[in-house]
């Protein structure tokens, strides 16, 4: 019995497709999407109007490549514990679909392409910041903090807060206060987001001896910390509008409503810190929170946004 030519062709194509999918999964694309949304917010806030399409596309691609490189290196370092944790054991490296040397070559290629593209199409500051983000995430967070400190996310969150700086720098060639406020927003958003996840999979982290906060101090104390960071996040988001004046009433209203809802959900979690459904709900909302907040920045920066902001400001009772 022999295979037809169509069958012989189909099997190699399926293998290639499976391998491409494995590399795609290695980069953690859902995380990249969220990082690129904050990059776009940084660009929009810096431009305060229409963006050069070529610059915008190049910056997003370059930022995406940098994030993919960082995530791949993270997967390389964590492949031993990923093989044990229920949530991660089927990732490409622990499952054997990609070999470590292949992942190394892939990650370094992505990092090099990111730097070259950002340096060519944007500027050296944007390229340098993206590279610094990779180094910070891999060396400081993944190697230095993740397995050794319960504050790993608090300090390591700075790596995830670099993309809006890259976006701002790509447009202006420098950094200013609004960019640093965006940086602070993402830094303060990170602990509630990841600690909510840690509450959901606390046993997994305990099994591999990763000292996430719920493992070290328990669920109740973690929920209180989530509430504290949510409380700090609200005035920080509003600082973009006042006193900096970098965002308008539409953003302000969105930030206020989102911040109050995050506080409400965090308070609910404090009342039932062992509730995984509440932790899951908070985790999912935190993703939508950051997406909508960045979307509000973009809306305020679009052509015609001043008239929209004026209409909102004139609304009775605003």
UniProtKB/Swiss-Prot annotation:
PROSITE patterns, per database record: UBIA
Residues that span the membrane, as ranges: 31-51, 55-75, 98-118, 125-145, 153-173, 181-201, 206-228, 238-260, 285-305
Gene Ontology CC terms: plasma membrane
Keyword Manganese: no
Pathway entry: Porphyrin-containing compound metabolism; heme O biosynthesis; heme O from protoheme: step 1/1
This protein's UniProt keywords: Cell inner membrane, Cell membrane, Heme biosynthesis, Membrane, Transferase, Transmembrane, Transmembrane helix
InterPro entries linked to this entry: Protohaem_IX_farnesylTrfase, UbiA_prenyltransferase, UbiA_prenylTrfase_CS, UbiA_sf
PANTHER family xref list: 4-HYDROXYBENZOATE SOLANESYLTRANSFERASE, PROTOHEME IX FARNESYLTRANSFERASE, MITOCHONDRIAL
Protein name: Protoheme IX farnesyltransferase
Species for this entry: Synechococcus elongatus (strain ATCC 33912 / PCC 7942 / FACHB-805) (Anacystis nidulans R2)
């Amino acid at each position: 019995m022999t295979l037809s030519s169509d069958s012989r062709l189909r099997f190699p194509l399926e293998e290639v497709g499976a391998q491409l999918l494995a590399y795609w999964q290695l980069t953690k694309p859902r995380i990249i999407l969220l990082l690129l949304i904050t990059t776009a917010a940084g660009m929009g806030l810096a431009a305060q109007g229409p963006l050069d399409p070529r610059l915008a596309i190049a910056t997003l691609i370059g930022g995406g490549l940098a994030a993919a490189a960082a995530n791949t290196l993270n997967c390389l370092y964590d492949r031993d514990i990923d093989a044990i944790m229920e949530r991660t054991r089927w990732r490409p490296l622990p499952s054997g679909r990609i070999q470590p040397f292949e992942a190394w070559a892939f990650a370094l290629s992505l990092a090099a392409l990111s730097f070259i593209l950002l340096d060519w199409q944007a500027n050296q500051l944007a390229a340098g910041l993206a590279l610094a983000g990779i180094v910070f995430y891999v060396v400081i967070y993944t190697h230095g903090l993740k397995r050794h400190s319960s504050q790993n996310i608090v300090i390591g969150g700075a790596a995830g807060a670099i993309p809006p700086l890259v976006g701002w720098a790509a447009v202006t060639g420098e950094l200013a206060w609004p960019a640093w406020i965006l940086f602070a927003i993402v830094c303060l958003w990170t602990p509630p987001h990841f600690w909510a996840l840690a509450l959901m999979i606390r046993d997994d982290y305990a099994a591999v001896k990763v000292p996430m906060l719920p493992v070290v101090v328990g669920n109740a104390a973690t929920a209180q910390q989530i509430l504290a960071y949510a409380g700090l996040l609200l005035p920080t988001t509003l600082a973009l509008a006042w006193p900096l004046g970098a965002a308008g009433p539409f953003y302000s209203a969105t930030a206020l409503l989102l911040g109050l809802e995050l506080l409400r959900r965090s308070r609910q979690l404090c009342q039932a810190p062992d509730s995984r459904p509440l932790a899951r709900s908070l985790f999912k909302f935190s993703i939508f929170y950051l997406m909508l907040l960045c979307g509000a920045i973009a809306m305020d920066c679009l052509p015609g946004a001043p008239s929209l902001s004026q209409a909102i400001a004139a609304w009775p009772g605003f």
